[in-house]
């Protein structure tokens, strides 16, 4: 009970409510405990697998496909007002679906039976440690894994030479969790290229107008595949290197050397025919969304290709 003097003959008494403070602390402790338990339960629920794919992947896929379905009814009106804005919204949804599919495929294939069960791994540890003790090696190898290299400093022979399957490192399957950062970056890339995609289609339709129809289509396809595709693919790898992966000039050079030419070759196997159909059949206001819709499969491949090591 502290006393505070304000002047002559004036005393103010403050009563400390210690019980209330303790109650508040207990309440906060209980609340924090329940919050942690709820978060853990939610994580467990979202990591539940349906057909080998987590509930998180399924939920996001359903939400984005439903949003795309509802968006289609408003596309014409949006395109009439602004072609860029309509393309922007379309790309965000389609690129989001592409990466969800890519991560779902990776999640599906990450779920398989370990070729070396844990009980065999533990047994191998036990036998190896006992042999080290008998040889006077003590327990220095307690921290070693069955998949470590047991080679001595001056020998090229390993105990695993007779068991090559033990040389494979134990994979840490991180593909069973959804990578929201990668997903967001992929949608941002779709958002970014919308500012170039819509004007590019307008340019092609405006520039090639006097020749017969088939000739116009071939000219547009060649212009698209020889100019737009190589540049946009290179820019995508730059974006993924610097933004998504935090790389530098050296990592970009390695990525381009390892992935660019082969990916561009795959592009030329798919997109010339797609764009020929696009420019020949589709109305002009549906050319961009048509290519983006077909691009769901391509972007899914591109996302997996970029994530490959």
UniProtKB/Swiss-Prot annotation:
Transmembrane segments: 53-73, 82-102, 184-204, 226-246, 261-281
Keyword Zinc: no
PTM note: N-glycosylated.
Family recorded in the similarity comment: Belongs to the peroxisomal membrane protein PXMP2/4 family.
Location of the protein in the cell: Vacuole membrane
Residues on Vacuolar side: 1-52, 103-183, 247-260
Full protein name: Vacuolar membrane protein YOR292C
Keyword line: Glycoprotein, Membrane, Transmembrane, Transmembrane helix, Vacuole
Cytoplasmic side, ranges: 74-81, 205-225, 282-309
GO cellular component labels: cytoplasm; fungal-type vacuole; mitochondrion; vacuolar membrane
Disulfide links within the chain: none
Record InterPro entries: Mpv17_PMP22 (IPR007248)
Membrane topology: Multi-pass membrane protein
Pfam families listed in its UniProt record: Mpv17_PMP22
Domain of life of the native organism: Eukaryota
Organism this protein belongs to: Saccharomyces cerevisiae (strain ATCC 204508 / S288c) (Baker's yeast)
Residues linked to a glycan: 19, 121
């Amino acid at each position: 009970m502290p006393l505070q003097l304000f002047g002559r003959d004036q005393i103010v008494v403050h009563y400390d409510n210690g019980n209330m403070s303790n109650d508040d602390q207990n309440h906060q402790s209980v609340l924090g405990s329940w919050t942690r338990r709820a978060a853990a339960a939610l994580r467990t629920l979202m990591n539940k697998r349906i057909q080998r794919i987590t509930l998180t992947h399924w939920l996001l896929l359903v939400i984005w496909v439903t949003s795309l379905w509802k968006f289609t009814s408003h596309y014409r009106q949006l395109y009439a007002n602004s072609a860029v804005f309509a393309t922007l919204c379309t790309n965000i949804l389609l690129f989001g679906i592409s990466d969800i599919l890519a991560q779902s495929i990776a999640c599906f294939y990450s779920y398989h039976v370990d070729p070396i069960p844990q009980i065999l791994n533990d047994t191998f540890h036990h036998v190896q440690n006992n042999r080290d003790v008998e040889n006077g090696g003590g327990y220095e190898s307690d921290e070693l894994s069955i998949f470590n290299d047991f080679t001595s400093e001056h020998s090229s022979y390993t105990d695993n030479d007779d068991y090559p399957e033990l040389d494979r490192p134990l994979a840490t399957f991180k593909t069973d969790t959804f990578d929201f950062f990668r997903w967001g970056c992929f949608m941002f890339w779709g958002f970014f290229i919308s500012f170039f995609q819509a004007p590019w289609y307008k340019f092609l339709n405006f520039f090639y107008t006097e020749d017969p129809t088939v000739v116009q289509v071939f000219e547009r396809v060649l212009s698209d595949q020889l100019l737009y595709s190589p540049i946009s693919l290179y820019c995508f790898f730059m974006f993924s290197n610097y933004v998504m992966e935090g790389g530098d000039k050296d990592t970009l050079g390695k990525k381009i050397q390892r992935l660019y030419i082969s990916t561009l070759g795959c592009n030329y196997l798919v997109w010339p025919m797609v764009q020929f159909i696009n420019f020949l059949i589709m109305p002009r206001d549906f050319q961009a969304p048509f290519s983006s819709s077909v691009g769901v499969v391509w972007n899914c491949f591109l996302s997996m290709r970029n994530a490959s090591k």
